[in-house]
Amino acid sequence: MMSTEQMQPLELSEDRLDKLDPRCSHLDDLSDQFIKDCDLKKKPRKGKNVQATLNVESDQKKPRRKDTPALHIPPFIPGVFSEHLIKRYDVQERHPKGKMIPVLHNTDLEQKKPRRKDTPALHMSPFAAGVTLLRDERPKAIVEDDEKDGDKIAI
């Protein structure tokens, strides 16, 4: 159980407060010796400090992105090349990778299959055995609202 009595503070001798106690004097010597022996410049610590030194070296080798000036090269316009562009930017006439020649582009569009959105849904009436279809009940294409305004495609 805990008692509620007041405890007397420990009495320390005057020589201990003055650090004249022989048991504590060696601590000052150890701390001085430790400071002399430790040289942080000789051995870098492993971990973050080593990476930081490597980053400093790599920063010196190549400039940061914000330090490099942006080179403005005018956009490619097919068939338009002047002597000024060729001399100033050392540009050679070439076709961009992402864009095709317009003539080839049109033929590719014709050969592509239509998207699912563009194809009409075929409506087949339910099959009933022994029943013949009337002329009005032939299979027909259901045309979406967008297509009703324009061309109607039936398959």
From Swiss-Prot:
One of its GO terms (molecular function) is protein serine/threonine phosphatase inhibitor activity. GO terms for biological process: central nervous system development; intracellular signal transduction; regulation of phosphatase activity. Residues 58-69 have a biased composition (Basic and acidic residues). InterPro entries: PPP1R17. Highly expressed in cerebellum. Substrate for cGMP-dependent protein kinase. Phosphorylated by PRKG1 isoform alpha. Phosphorylation of Thr-68 and Thr-119 is required for its phosphatase activity. Transmembrane segments: none annotated. Keywords: Phosphoprotein, Protein phosphatase inhibitor. The modification Phosphothreonine is found at T68, T119. Residues 41-73 are annotated as: Disordered. It comes from the Eukaryota. Inhibits phosphatase activities of protein phosphatase 1 (PP1) and protein phosphatase 2A (PP2A) complexes. This is Protein phosphatase 1 regulatory subunit 17. It comes from Homo sapiens (Human).
